């Protein structure tokens, strides 16, 4: 059956700020306490969605989550009216208010792991929301993620939306940022590739400076609950040294699509064995793996992290050629820019490079790949997504006007204590649910 890979990008929320909450994420730590521009952030992401939709790629939208999270603050012991809760948290524990106010759900690559119906045992598209248990500000996302996915992908004949795995370090799950899929065609059975940072119950190398957020046990559990064919499922360990260099998810050092793996030479432990396994497994499903390995001599790990070369989108055109979507920081790094020029001029599958200004997201450690969740859908499954979430001229105009109306153009850490920010956000999100036709999605609407 005909199928297409859709990218569902997260709309940046009204509380987008730089609180430095993500240890192991170099950009997040480096920009801590600086002022953010939520309006610019949201519009930068929206423009990327629109341009890719205009180029013929299937592009969807995922709404922001409600922030600040009064549920979290009340759980942590702050009481009273909503304004009182925010005031108490701001005075007594501003770091907790920052965690409750994070707009990190914008990075939907961490929202869930998705397996298309061509790969699963029951022939449905399976979603497992990521528990994101390594960081408080992200561990509060999965309930709302499940609600959103269950709203958009509601037909049980086509979709299965699971609960997140239990939020324990042994099952640390960071979603699709550590997962990719290879195939001959999107609608045919493929090979699912899970990358982990450490194993809870197996001896092996681990990072020493920054934590490994994804475990082997979590990856295996997701594959099992999705009913994947064991002979078409490959696991690999990310090199702990690159985690210590700031590669907190695999999508900061590697990206794959269809029959192509674009990766850094230092991305994996036992890389040649991984390449060989992927090649043999994909060959059994009718495709030949193309490995584009970037040598450290051309682009160092540090350059990869600062430019986010690999936190890119690798998209297939109808003619089979591929385009790489990168942040503008790649053009500002001389070595990375030179490599990209050489790549596009070569005879490989990647023929074009598209550059986007995503500066606001990048300063928090999120490039093009972070902002999107890939969902392969056949024609019947796409028709079952009935909400108004597919990017087109009309939706773009509505969302652009909505952002202009509701978002601030400056948000500093001290502004999180402003109780009117909660009211502004709720007003904006209430209107957004009407634009996207997703019903009463948020707690404050119920």
UniProtKB/Swiss-Prot annotation:
InterPro entries (UniProt xref) = AstB_sf, SuccinylArg_d-Hdrlase_AstB
Q: In which pathway does it act?
A: Amino-acid degradation; L-arginine degradation via AST pathway; L-glutamate and succinate from L-arginine: step 2/5
- Give the record's keywords alphabetically: Arginine metabolism, Hydrolase
Residues at the catalytic site: 174, 249, 370
Mind listing the GO molecular function terms for this protein? Answer: N-succinylarginine dihydrolase activity
One Pfam match: AstB
Q: Which residues form the signal peptide?
A: none
- Please state which protein family the record places this protein in: Belongs to the succinylarginine dihydrolase family.
Protein name as annotated: N-succinylarginine dihydrolase
């Amino acid at each position: 059956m005909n199928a297409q890979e859709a990218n569902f990008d997260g709309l940046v929320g009204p509380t987008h700020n730089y609180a430095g909450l993500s240890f192991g994420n170099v950009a997040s730590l480096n920009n801590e306490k600086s002022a953010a521009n939520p309006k610019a952030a949201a519009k930068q992401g929206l423009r990327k969605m629109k341009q890719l939709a205009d180029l013929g790629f299937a592009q969807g939208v995922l709404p922001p989550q409600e922030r600040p999270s009064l549920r979290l603050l009340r759980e942590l012991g702050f009481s009273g009216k909503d304004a009182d809760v925010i005031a108490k948290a701001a005075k007594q524990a501003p770091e907790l208010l920052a965690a409750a106010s994070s707009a990190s759900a914008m990075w939907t690559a961490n929202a869930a792991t998705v397996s298309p119906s061509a790969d699963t045992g029951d022939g449905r598209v399976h979603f497992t929301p990521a528990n994101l248990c390594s960081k408080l500000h992200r561990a509060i996302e999965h309930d709302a993620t499940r609600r959103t996915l269950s709203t958009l992908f509601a037909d049980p004949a086509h979709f299965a939306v699971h609960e997140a795995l239990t939020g324990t370090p042994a099952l640390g799950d960071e979603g699709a940022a550590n997962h990719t899929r290879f195939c001959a065609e999107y609608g045919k059975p493929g090979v699912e590739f899970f990358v982990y940072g450490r194993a809870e119950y197996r001896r092996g190398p681990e990072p020493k400076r920054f934590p490994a957020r994804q475990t082997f046990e979590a990856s295996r559990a997701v594959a099992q609950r999705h009913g994947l064919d064991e002979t078409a499922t490959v696991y690999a360990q990310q090199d702990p040294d690159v985690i210590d260099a700031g590669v907190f998810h695999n999508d900061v050092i590697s990206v794959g699509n269809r029959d192509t793996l674009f990766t850094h030479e230092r991305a994996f432990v036992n890389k040649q064995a991984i390449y060989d396994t992927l090649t043999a497994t994909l060959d059994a499903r009718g495709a030949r793996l193309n490995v584009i390995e970037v040598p450290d001599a051309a682009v160092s790990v540090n350059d990869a992290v600062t430019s986010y070369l690999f936190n890119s989108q690798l998209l297939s055109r109808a003619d089979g050629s591929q385009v790489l979507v990168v942040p503008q920081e790649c053009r500002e790094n001389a070595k990375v820019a030179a490599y990209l020029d050489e790549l596009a001029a070569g005879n490989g599958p990647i023929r074009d490079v598209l550059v986007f200004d995503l500066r606001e997201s990048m300063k928090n450690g999120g490039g093009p790949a972070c902002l999107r969740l890939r969902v392969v859908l056949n024609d019947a499954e796409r028709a079952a997504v009935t909400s108004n979430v597919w990017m087109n001229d009309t939706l773009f105009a509505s969302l652009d006007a909505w952002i202009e109306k509701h978002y601030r153009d400056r948000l500093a850490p001290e502004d999180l204590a402003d109780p009117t920010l909660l009211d502004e956000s709720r007003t904006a999100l209430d209107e957004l649910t009407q634009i996207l036709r997703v019903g009463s999605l948020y707690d404050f609407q119920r």
